[in-house]
Regions:
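Catalytic alpha/beta core domains of metabolic enzymes, predominantly
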Residues: 125-128, 141-190
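Active-site beta->alpha loop and helix N-cap motifs at the rims of alpha/beta catalytic domains
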Residues: 2-9, 13-145, 153
Length: 190
């Protein structure tokens, strides 16, 4: 089942000159998106500077967004990390705040194997069993590609892995992935 249909907007995280999050401006951005019929908000993804925020800022930004959006549209929180335990901690927190789904980027820099990806995503999903997870496949940024068979395996075997944000641009890979997943995986482009 789709978490949303239509357009999910990856929100920037506005900052002051000193590098602190500008929550007043973030609220303006959120209100503008909702007023203009955005179907879902994606917070703390690549566009949201997730890799440059401290864990505290990251979680504060997610909580602020969930509170301000207040269920008017789904909020998908980016909680991925190259460290499985960090991703679990961030995911549990975001789930406790009421995130509608979690966006989990592949581990970056260390180039996980497909077996490693299965272990990583399964551990995170098992830590937040009631919260839908969307895998985020952006190998141009992470150096790690979720292969079609891996995505299909996870979708079929881990109940709350429900989708993939597929950013490879490889249409043959995407077609194969969706075929292997046999209707068990929602596809989000990005």
């Amino acid at each position: 089942m789709a978490i949303f249909k239509g357009t999910g907007v990856a929100i920037v995280t506005p900052m002051y000159e000193d590098g602190k999050v500008n929550f007043e401006k973030l609220e303006e951005i959120l209100e503008d998106q909702i007023a203009n019929s955005t179907d879902a908000i994606v917070i703390c993804g690549t566009t949201g500077e997730s890799s440059t925020l401290t864990h505290g800022e990251h979680l504060q930004t997610i909580k602020f967004t969930i509170d301000k959006v207040n269920k008017r549209v789904p909020v998908i929180a980016g909680t991925g990390s190259n460290c499985t335990e960090t991703a679990i901690m961030m995911s549990k927190e975001a789930a406790s705040y009421g995130a509608d789904a979690l966006l989990i980027v592949t581990p970056y820099y260390n180039k996980a194997t497909q077996k490693g990806l299965i272990a990583h995503y399964t551990a995170i999903a098992n830590a937040v069993p009631e919260t839908p997870l969307i895998m985020y496949n952006v190998p141009s940024r992470t150096g790690c590609n979720i292969q079609p068979a891996t995505a299909a395996y996870l979708a079929k075997n881990v109940k709350n892995i429900v989708g993939i944000k597929e950013a490879t641009g490889d249409l043959s890979q995407i077609a194969k992935m969706m075929s292997l997943a046999d209707g068990q995986l929602e596809l989000y482009s990005g």
